[in-house]
C-alpha cells in the first residue's frame, strides 16, 4: 500500500486543482492536481505521453487550461502568457535550453527583463554586475561577459538556471536537466539543486531516471494517460511502486525471461577497419541471438554499426550473410541482404517526423503495399497496423504525424518500419535511450519475441542493466578495438566497466582468431 504524504507545516507555494486540457481527439490532462512546497523537490514521473510536458506548458503560460484552478500562495492566478507565469515566480529549464549563442552570458540571463537606465536604454554595466552576482551565488565558473557560443552544454544549463534566479523564481521546473550531462556534471547539478532547496524554492524535477529521482526528490507525483494517479513521500516508496503507478500494472521484470538458445550463423564480419573509427573487428551473429555491444562514448560502436549497414565504407574487411560473401556498400544493399539499422538519433536519422505513422512504417516496404506502380492505401494501413500493434504503439490514429508522438512511440515507429522489411538481422543502436520505463519494457519484450522467432539482433547500449538483462553475448569496445567478448555467464557490471575503461587488456590478434 502506497502511503500518502502527510500535510507539511508550510502551505504549498503552488497548487493545481482539477486542471484539464484537451486537444482535437486527445484529452491531454484530465482533472489533474499537483502541489509544490517551498524548500522541496517534487519528482514528476510518468511514461512518455502521460501529460508531463502539457502540465509544464500550462504552468509556464504557454497553454491555457480548459478547466481547473491554479493558485500561488493561496491566491488564484490566470496565466495567459509566459510573462504572466514569470511574474508569478514560475520558470522552467528545459531539456534543450532555449538560449542565444550570439549573445553574452549576461544578455541571456536578463533577456526580456534587462535593467534599464535613462531614456529606457539597457544599463549594460548593471546587467553584467547583477549577472555575475547570480553566477557567483550558484558557484558557476563563468564570466558574465563571455559569449554563450563559447560554452559547453553543462555551462549553458548553469546560464539557464541563473536566468531563472534573475527573476527571483520561487518555482523552478527542471525538465530532464541531466540528459546531455556527464556524471560529474550531474553531481554538480545535484549540489546546485540542494542550494536552491536551502533558499526555500520549490522545484519540480522531471526525469525518466529512477536513480536521479531517489537521489534528489523529497516527494513524487505520478501521471498516467493524462491523469494524476499517485503522490507521496519518496521515503515511502520503492522503484517497483513507482513503476506500478506509471504503467497501471505490476512490472516484475523489465527484462523478459528467455531461453538464450541460438541457431545457425547469420552474419560474420572479419577484419573490419576504418581509418579513424575502428580497426580489426571480427564478430559472428546467430539466429535467435541478442549480441550486446558495450563501451564508453567514442569507443566506435555506432560507427561500426553504420559500416555494417553500409552508411560508411570500411577500409578493410569482409562480410558474410549465412555463409556467403557479400558486398555491403550502401544501406540499400544492406536491406537487400536482410540487414536493417535503427539509429540512436531517431529524430534526425530514423523517422520522417513530418510524415504520418503509416507512411513512415511502409516507406522501405513499398513493394508490399503497391500494385502496378500504384500505392494501395488499405495495404499501407494494414501493414503499419500489424507492426505498430505488436509494439503497443500509443497514438490517436495511424495518420498522426510522427513528430507529434512521444520519444518512446517514435522509437516504436522506427523499429516497426524496419521489421516490416522482414530482415534477418536488426541492429538497434541505443534502442531505449530517452524513453520511459514502460516503453522500455515493451521494447525489451518485443526484442525477446523477435529473437524467439529466429531474428538475429545486435543491441548497442550504454545502459549496463540493459546489457546484462538482454544479451546472450557481449562485445566490449574500447578506442575502436574489441576489448573483450563475454558470454552471458561471465557478465557483471564490474567486468563491463573494467574492460570499457581500459583496466583490462584489449583482445589481441591471436585471441581474435580463436573465436568460433
From Swiss-Prot:
ATP binds at residues 46-53. Keywords: ATP-binding, Cell inner membrane, Cell membrane, Membrane, Nucleotide-binding, Repeat, Sugar transport, Translocase, Transport. It comes from the Bacteria. It catalyses: D-ribose(out) + ATP + H2O = D-ribose(in) + ADP + phosphate + H(+). Coiled coil: none annotated. Its main location: membrane. GO terms for molecular function: ABC-type D-ribose transporter activity; ATP binding; ATP hydrolysis activity. Its EC number is 7.5.2.7. It is a peripheral membrane protein. One of its GO terms (cellular component) is plasma membrane. The keyword Cytoplasm does not apply. It is found in: Cell inner membrane. Residues 14-250, 261-504 form the ABC transporter domain. Belongs to the ABC transporter superfamily. Ribose importer (TC 3.A.1.2.1) family. The complex is composed of an ATP-binding protein (RbsA), two transmembrane proteins (RbsC) and a solute-binding protein (RbsB). Part of the ABC transporter complex RbsABC involved in ribose import. Responsible for energy coupling to the transport system. This is Ribose import ATP-binding protein RbsA. It comes from Jannaschia sp. (strain CCS1). The gene is rbsA.
Amino acid at each position: 500500500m502506497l502511503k500518502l504524504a502527510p500535510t507539511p507545516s508550510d502551505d504549498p507555494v503552488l497548487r493545481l486543482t482539477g486542471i484539464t486540457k484537451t486537444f482535437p481527439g486527445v484529452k491531454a490532462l484530465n482533472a489533474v492536481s499537483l502541489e509544490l512546497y517551498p524548500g522541496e523537490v517534487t519528482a514528476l514521473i510518468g511514461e512518455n505521453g502521460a501529460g508531463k510536458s502539457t502540465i509544464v506548458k500550462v504552468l509556464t503560460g504557454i497553454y491555457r487550461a480548459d478547466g481547473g484552478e491554479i493558485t500561488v500562495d493561496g491566491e488564484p492566478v490566470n496565466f495567459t502568457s509566459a510573462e504572466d507565469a514569470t511574474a508569478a515566480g514560475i520558470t522552467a529549464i528545459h531539456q534543450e535550453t532555449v538560449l542565444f549563442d550570439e549573445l553574452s552570458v549576461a544578455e541571456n540571463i536578463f533577456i526580456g527583463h534587462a535593467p534599464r537606465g535613462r531614456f529606457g536604454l539597457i544599463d549594460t554595466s548593471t546587467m553584467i554586475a547583477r549577472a555575475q552576482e547570480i553566477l557567483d551565488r550558484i558557484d558557476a565558473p563563468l564570466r558574465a561577459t563571455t559569449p554563450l557560443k563559447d560554452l559547453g552544454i553543462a555551462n549553458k544549463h548553469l546560464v539557464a538556471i541563473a536566468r531563472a534566479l534573475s527573476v527571483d523564481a520561487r518555482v523552478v521546473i527542471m525538465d530532464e536537466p541531466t540528459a546531455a550531462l556527464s556524471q560529474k556534471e550531474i553531481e554538480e547539478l545535484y549540489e546546485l539543486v540542494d542550494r536552491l532547496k536551502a533558499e526555500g524554492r520549490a522545484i519540480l524535477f522531471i526525469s525518466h531516471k529512477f536513480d536521479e529521482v531517489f537521489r534528489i526528490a523529497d516527494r513524487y507525483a505520478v501521471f498516467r494517460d493524462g491523469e494524476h494517479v499517485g503522490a507521496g513521500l519518496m521515503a515511502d516508496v520503492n522503484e517497483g511502486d513507482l513503476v506500478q503507478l506509471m504503467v497501471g500494472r505490476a512490472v516484475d521484470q523489465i527484462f523478459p525471461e528467455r531461453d538464450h538458445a541460438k541457431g545457425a550463423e547469420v552474419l560474420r564480419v572479419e577484419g573490419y577497419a576504418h581509418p579513424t573509427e575502428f580497426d580489426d573487428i571480427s564478430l559472428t551473429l546467430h539466429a535467435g541471438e541478442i549480441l550486446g555491444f558495450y563501451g564508453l562514448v567514442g569507443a566506435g560502436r555506432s560507427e561500426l554499426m553504420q559500416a555494417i549497414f553500409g552508411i560508411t565504407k570500411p577500409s578493410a574487411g569482409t562480410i558474410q550473410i549465412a555463409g556467403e560473401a557479400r558486398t555491403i556498400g550502401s544501406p540499400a544493399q544492406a536491406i537487400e541482404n536482410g540487414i536493417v539499422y535503427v539509429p540512436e538519433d531517431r529524430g534526425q536519422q530514423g523517422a520522417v517526423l513530418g510524415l504520418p505513422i503509416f507512411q513512415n512504417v511502409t516507406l522501405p516496404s513499398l513493394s508490399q503495399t503497391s500494385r502496378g506502380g500504384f500505392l494501395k492505401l488499405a495495404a499501407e494501413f494494414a501493414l503499419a497496423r500489424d507492426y505498430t500493434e505488436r509494439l503497443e504503439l500509443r497514438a490517436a490514429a495511424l495518420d498522426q504525424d510522427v513528430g507529434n508522438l512521444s520519444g518512446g512511440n517514435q522509437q516504436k515507429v522506427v523499429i516497426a518500419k524496419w521489421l516490416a522489411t522482414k530482415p534477418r538481422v536488426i541492429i538497434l543502436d541505443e534502442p531505449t535511450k530517452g524513453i520511459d520505463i514502460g516503453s522500455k519494457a515493451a521494447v525489451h519484450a518485443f526484442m525477446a519475441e523477435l529473437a524467439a522467432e529466429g531474428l538475429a539482433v545486435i543491441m548497442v547500449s550504454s545502459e549496463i542493466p540493459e546489457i546484462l538483462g538482454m544479451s546472450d553475448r557481449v562485445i566490449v569496445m574500447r578506442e575502436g578495438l574489441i576489448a573483450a567478448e563475454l558470454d552471458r555467464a561471465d557478465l557483471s557490471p564490474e567486468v563491463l566497466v573494467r574492460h570499457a575503461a581500459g583496466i583490462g587488456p584489449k583482445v589481441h590478434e591471436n585471441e581474435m582468431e580463436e573465436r568460433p
